[in-house]
Amino acid sequence: MHTAEILETLASGGVLPPETAHMAFDRLMSGEMTPAQAGSFLMGLRSHGETPELVASAVRAALAHARLIQGLEYDRIDIVGTGGDGRNSFNCSTAAALTLAGMGYKVVKHGNRAVSSTSGSADVVEGLGLPLETAPEDVPVLLARHNFVFLFAPFYHPAFRHVMPVRRDLGIRTLFNVLGPLLNPARPTRMLLGVAKPAMLHTMADALLLTGVRRAAVVHGAGGYDELTTMGPARVVMVRDGATEEMEINPADHGFAPCTPAQLEVHDRQEALEVMRLLLAGEGPAPMLDMMAFNAGLAVYLMEDSMPISAAMARARQAVAGGAGGKVLDA
């Protein structure tokens, strides 16, 4: 099918079959579309709506152009959010990921520099002295040694150079705003994925099912965050055994005290880094430590098929208090 026919289908409100969507995304990633075609395609997708099938087609096409990591035959997890929650909170996903690695779990953290937040995961990781651009063949060695590796999105997805100028010129939200968390080149078998909009909970969960993740939780935190917070109960869609199930996780059930948005904020990159160093040592503001443990606890639950969530939360609280994340930096 010619690109013009694909654009006509979208313009007339038609639905792209998965194989056609994959073909179109492949052309976009390979630079075969002109800037005008690429912009029209992204606008058409926005009008079409982000279905799980469309998201999964985009993921498969993007990964086909990525620098994939081979040789990982064990369970591994990513803790990541879509961003876009408009909160200048500390980088909880990175703190929880490093804590998990300090507990002995294999963590493949895929991320980028800040877009809508004060400090992105790449900014924090770089500030902590960890490498950003790790060659794919070196990842298994680093994972075996440290249980943690950071995968810098621009390095692993060179094909995105064809998409970024168009996204920048459009200046509006597109499908690519939610794709990032699903494009981990290490293809994690487990995932804790946060979404800023509750309407995306089931879309992302169903997309994870279609892309083969074994066990995952898609969460929307109280207060409108793309991660768990201790402000109140979180909406969660679990992905396991080939199906999805919506549930609620209440921080009060696990002994976490409520907090306010102001208690989770950082105001610039320097503060974000200073706070991160404290948290990884088991020090710093109690509300941030609690949020760290809450997210790490759910991640432990995802990694342990037979552990009750209460036990997973207790283990994570103990690890956070003991500075497990900081030990990864010292290894």
Curated annotation (Swiss-Prot):
Gene Ontology MF terms: anthranilate phosphoribosyltransferase activity; magnesium ion binding
GO biological process, alphabetically ordered: L-tryptophan biosynthetic process
Signal peptide (residue range): none
Record InterPro entries: Anthranilate_Pribosyl_Tfrase (IPR005940), Glycosyl_Trfase_fam3 (IPR000312), Glycosyl_Trfase_fam3_N_dom (IPR017459), Glycosyl_Trfase_fam3_N_dom_sf (IPR036320), Nuc_phospho_transferase (IPR035902)
UniProt-annotated binding residues for 5-phospho-alpha-D-ribose 1-diphosphate: 81, 84-85, 89, 91-94, 109-117, 121
EC code(s) of this entry: 2.4.2.18
GO cellular component terms attached to this protein's record: cytosol
Keyword tRNA-binding assigned: no
This protein's UniProt keywords: Amino-acid biosynthesis, Aromatic amino acid biosynthesis, Glycosyltransferase, Magnesium, Metal-binding, Transferase, Tryptophan biosynthesis
Binding site for anthranilate 1: G81, N112
Positions with a binding annotation for Mg(2+) 2: D226, E227
Pathway: Amino-acid biosynthesis; L-tryptophan biosynthesis; L-tryptophan from chorismate: step 2/5
Cofactors: Mg(2+)
Catalytic activity: N-(5-phospho-beta-D-ribosyl)anthranilate + diphosphate = 5-phospho-alpha-D-ribose 1-diphosphate + anthranilate
Binding, anthranilate 2: R167
Similarity section: Belongs to the anthranilate phosphoribosyltransferase family.
Its job: Catalyzes the transfer of the phosphoribosyl group of 5-phosphorylribose-1-pyrophosphate (PRPP) to anthranilate to yield N-(5'-phosphoribosyl)-anthranilate (PRA).
Listed name of the protein: Anthranilate phosphoribosyltransferase
Name of the gene encoding the protein in the UniProt record: trpD
